[in-house]
Amino acid sequence: MKVKKILNRTEYIETEIKRSKRKFDYCKVSYEDVSNFDKLIKLHHKYEEIGPILCLGTRNGREIDLFRNIIFGNPVINTLIKIFEVKRYGSTSLFPFFESFDRSSTNDIRDKSVIGVEINPDAKRTDTHICSFDEMPENWENKFKIIYSNSFDQSQDPEKTAQEWLRIAHPGAIIIIGFSYTAATDTDPVGEIEIDDLKELFGGKIIYYSNLHGFYHNVAIQID
């Protein structure tokens, strides 16, 4: 793992907001991805209730809707979501209305809540808290049983970010991280990430690893 040092915090936040605005309509996560995560979670989670669930770096929020519907939602609605998904600048829906039912609230986080964190103020909605994912609300400590992000490479300081994610994770939580082995840049300061780097940062036990097409990876870590 290599880190491009960005010492100015204000500059870092402004850069990440601009990046989010440019890619706001892009959602890397698909219905199939979250369906696979759902199977993994149900196989390994330690508690009667799976949630609450937290998605980090959510941009337009579609991944929040996918996690909520697939894990906690109506099977009929899920069938419609799957049918109307198209691959267009990532994954999107021809009829996003079907994905918007029963969104959670950041002001009332329950066992079946699915919440997002996004640095871009344009993403504000009832289930999305606007902040950096390495500076989250103090009262979220030990809150979330499932944490998902494909944005770890956007961290300014990977050790600080990992500690913050561990702080808000419930004991025994599953943290799912998508990452690629690309060089560090101004917008993705953490580059050349390897699975051993994440294991060292987060500890716990690796319960899942996938190598997609040789350049993109998903890893699931169950923390102690």
PLM region descriptions:
Residues M1-E48:
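Class I SAM-dependent methyltransferase Rossmann-like catalytic core
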Residues C131-I147:
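A short acidic, Gly/Pro-enriched loop at the edge of an enzyme's catalytic core
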Residues G172-Y181:
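Conserved beta-strand signature within the Rossmann-like core of class I S-adenosyl-L-methionine
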